[in-house]
Amino acid sequence: MALGVAAASLFATSSASSHGYTDSPISRQKLCANGTVKNCGDIQWEPQSVEGLKGFPAAGPADGRICAGGNSRFSQLDDPRGGAWPTTKVTAGQSYTFRWQFTARHATTDFRYYITKNGWTGTKALTRADLDTQPFLVVPYNNQQPPSTLSHSGTIPAGKSGKAVILAVWTIADTGNAFYACSDVQF
């Protein structure tokens, strides 16, 4: 799979106080925060706090704990819920605008986007074996701080079908951590 590198489109809005999550496609943590998904535990109040070790896929959260960034407080994000997470409709091979919302901005190494392999059913917690471990989109950020809203345009890989998860990883430059967001999609 070819590695995409994108230029970032910036849209600034006001800032609050914590970290960040994706809302396009909508992430599991945002679905919990806006009340679409119930029984989410602490993540419903802290969608911006899914922070774990950086270095994915060689390091970072353990298999089965990826969507929660390895953070046990947010383990509901790793719960497959029988494959019933709401999905965003996407088209394989088409351009898509991925969007992050930040409540605290950090010096950033890059943003990386991964997707599950065809045949993934969503009935078990996400593992590296479920993912194409080569990101389909990488957006270098050269130690800059993003604005409070940031969009990246990239192409969703061709040949994808069925259900999938897009894993977005925001790698922080000046700490050992990254932020993780899982978005359930349907082709």
Q: Where are the language model's segments positioned?
A:
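Secretory targeting and sorting signals
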Residues: 1-18
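Internal, hydrophobic beta-strand segments that form the core of beta-sheet-rich folds
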Residues: 112, 116, 160-175
